């Protein structure tokens, strides 16, 4: 059994990133193998790791076991808090020739399962806590929101059982915590044992070899981005510190959304740098951090990544992610139950508050008042506050001026729509995660036609993959064009050069007639060049046709304008934002 686990671990170490191997595979320990029933039992140290290993790696481990023992093997995952300690012993070199692998039941010297080299010793030290990294099966790629509604905490208030007679509002009785005491457990949490953590409890996953082979297992990228403390010089998490099995449920953080799977480009590099700085220095720099941008651009991904990193650094930290609508709902419930004292104690004692889409507070005066008090208390206690919105603070209507001034008091960072190269990179990564080879020219074709947000890109990719599978065709530009014909038709529908000229003239406050005139002042020539660029990008008109519609200009003039604006768009975030607004307006 030790030979098998060393060989399996060696193979998985080659397939996974170092952080993922240390986080998910190294803490596991084989418990027993029944030679009669071919049942293998593997222990995980806590429910959190058990659930993730079972959901992400059980198929691969089962396949390796079947290959090693040359039989149908079922894998049973056992919950055992002492597993991490025993795992180190199983990583020690084994005696040669003690495991199966041939007709005589002995492995060939120096070989492991499937003929690959036997495992080398990996050290006998107990596992420390590596940087937080989830298996890469559902990456967020820098853009996109939580993969499940549960990440928003909708319908799940942050406090306890409303039916508790000793606590009518169902809220905890935590008192405000001074700055010096942050990171201590909640009252009543000492000695807490996670549900289901009894020694010897078993969760069983059984698969035959066919199912194990059929079950998808996708190796993540081999060169992940570094964790924040590695980039910014923060301290490495202390050994033994790890999020408990219920900590993500309490915080409403989505563990899949991390810095590792956040794709960075010019459009979001400043926001990511600010997020990393905050993750390493919560409550000290950039407080509050205010991120704003359109839908599907990665705001929620970034704030979850901050929370997940801080949770790794200090699993006892009181962290709460909440959507603004749910915060409003919590205020209403507290009002109905006359439980504002408990409500305040909960929110005022957090170490990190992540609140999404703050624009939903518009017009809700009581909610704004309660949030103002919570904000003031958290800042006074040096807790970190992170806010997202779809617009700049001063542009939000229906929000109290004193709140707006608080939002502006920290760091405000915009996340812009991704540039062409970044959209291509996101599509290629998403395709790789699906184990599908998408030609680069196809990715460029899709990225060129779909610019609004990355959710739209991912939806288009799913349509292409489904169309290719259903029709048994390779993915080409022709197949892509056919798969996306409805989407592309909608993109180009009702967009005319005349409409583009009028929209640009209104946007830049010039006359439509200036689009055809020979005037060359900068305040006219620039909008005219932008309109030419959009006409080339959003219509099927040729360069000569566009030139004719702009006062009979030569096609070389149009080509110069298109190239000039395209080049400046890749370098100028403000221009990129303006073009994005114009494109969205034209597409309706």
UniProtKB/Swiss-Prot annotation:
UniProt region (Domain III, AAA+ region), positions on chain: 252-468
Pfam families, A to Z: Bac_DnaA, Bac_DnaA_C, DnaA_N
Coiled-coil stretches noted in the UniProt entry, renumbered to this chain: none
SMART domains xref list: AAA (SM00382), Bac_DnaA_C (SM00760)
Region of interest (Domain I, interacts with DnaA modulators), residue spans: 1-73
One GO molecular-function entry: DNA replication origin binding
Segments of this protein annotated with the region Domain II: 73-251
PROSITE patterns recorded: DNAA (PS01008)
Localization of this protein: Cytoplasm
Primary location recorded for the protein, binned into one broad class: cytoplasm
GO biological process: DNA replication initiation; regulation of DNA replication
Self-association state and partner proteins as the record states: Oligomerizes as a right-handed, spiral filament on DNA at oriC.
Family under the similarity heading: Belongs to the DnaA family.
Purpose: Plays an essential role in the initiation and regulation of chromosomal replication. ATP-DnaA binds to the origin of replication (oriC) to initiate formation of the DNA replication initiation complex once per cell cycle. Binds the DnaA box (a 9 base pair repeat at the origin) and separates the double-stranded (ds)DNA. Forms a right-handed helical filament on oriC DNA; dsDNA binds to the exterior of the filament while single-stranded (ss)DNA is stabiized in the filament's interior.
UniProt-listed PANTHER family: CHROMOSOMAL REPLICATION INITIATOR PROTEIN DNAA
Protein known as: Chromosomal replication initiator protein DnaA
Gene for this chain: dnaA
């Amino acid at each position: 059994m030790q030979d098998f686990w060393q060989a399996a671990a060696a193979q998985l170490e080659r397939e996974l990133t170092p952080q993922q191997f240390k986080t998910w595979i190294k803490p596991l320990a084989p418990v027993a193998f029944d030679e009669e029933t071919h049942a293998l039992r593997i222990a995980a140290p806590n429910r959190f790791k058990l659930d993730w290993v079972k959901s992400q790696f059980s198929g691969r481990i089962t396949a390796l076991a079947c290959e090693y023992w040359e039989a149908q093997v079922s894998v049973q995952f056992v919950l055992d808090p002492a597993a991490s300690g025993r795992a180190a012993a199983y990583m020690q070199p084994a005696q040669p020739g003690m495991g199966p692998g041939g007709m005589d039941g002995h492995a060939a010297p120096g070989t492991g399962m499937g003929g690959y080299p036997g495992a080398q010793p990996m050290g006998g030290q107990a596992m420390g806590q590596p940087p937080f990294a989830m298996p890469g099966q559902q990456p967020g790629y820098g853009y996109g929101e939580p993969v499940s509604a549960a990440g928003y905490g909708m319908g799940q208030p942050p406090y306890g059982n409303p039916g508790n007679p000793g606590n009518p509002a169902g809220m905890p009785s935590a008192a405000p915590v001074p700055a010096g005491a942050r990171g201590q457990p909640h009252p009543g949490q000492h000695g807490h044992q996670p549900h289901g953590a009894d020694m010897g409890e078993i969760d069983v996953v059984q698969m035959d070899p066919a199912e194990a082979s059929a079950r998808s297992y996708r190796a993540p990228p081999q060169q992940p981005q570094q964790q924040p403390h590695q980039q910014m010089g923060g301290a490495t998490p202390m050994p033994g510190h790890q999020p408990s099995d219920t900590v993500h449920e309490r915080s409403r953080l989505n563990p899949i959304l991390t810095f590792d799977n956040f794709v960075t480009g010019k459009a979001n590099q400043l926001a990511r740098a600010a997020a990393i700085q905050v993750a390493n220095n919560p409550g000290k720099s950039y407080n509050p951090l205010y991120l704003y941008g359109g839908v599907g651009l990665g705001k929620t991904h970034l704030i979850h990544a901050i929370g997940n990193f801080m949770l790794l650094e200090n699993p006892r930290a009181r962290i709460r992610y909440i959507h603004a609508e749910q915060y409003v709902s919590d205020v209403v419930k507290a009002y109905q139950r006359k439980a504002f004292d408990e409500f305040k104690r909960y929110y005022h004692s957090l170490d990190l508050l992540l609140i999404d889409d703050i624009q939903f507070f518009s017009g809700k005066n009581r909610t704004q008042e309660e949030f103002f008090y919570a904000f003031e208390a958290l800042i006074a206690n040096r807790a970190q506050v992170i806010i997202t919105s779809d617009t700049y603070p001063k542009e939000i209507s229906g929000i109290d001026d004193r709140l707006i001034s608080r939002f502006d008091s920290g760091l405000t960072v915009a996340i812009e729509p991704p540039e062409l190269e970044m959209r291509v990179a996101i599509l290629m990564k998403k395709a790789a995660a699906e184990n599908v080879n998408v030609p680069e020219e196809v990715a460029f074709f899709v990225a060129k036609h779909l610019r609004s947000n990355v959710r739209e890109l991912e939806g288009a990719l799913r349509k292409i993959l489904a169309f290719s599978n259903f029709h048994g065709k390779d993915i080409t530009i022709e197949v892509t064009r056919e798969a996306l014909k409805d989407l592309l038709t909608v993109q180009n529908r009702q967009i005319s050069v005349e409409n583009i000229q009028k929209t640009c003239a209104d946007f830049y406050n010039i006359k439509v007639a200036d689009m055809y005139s020979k005037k060359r002042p900068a305040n006219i020539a620039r909008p005219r060049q932008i309109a030419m660029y959009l006409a080339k990008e959003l219509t099927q008109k040729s360069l000569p046709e566009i030139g004719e519609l702009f006062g009979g200009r030569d096609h070389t003039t149009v080509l110069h304008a298109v190239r000039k604006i395209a080049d400046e768009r890749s370098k100028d975030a403000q221009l990129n934002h303006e073009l994005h607004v114009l494109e969205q307006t034209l597409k309706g």
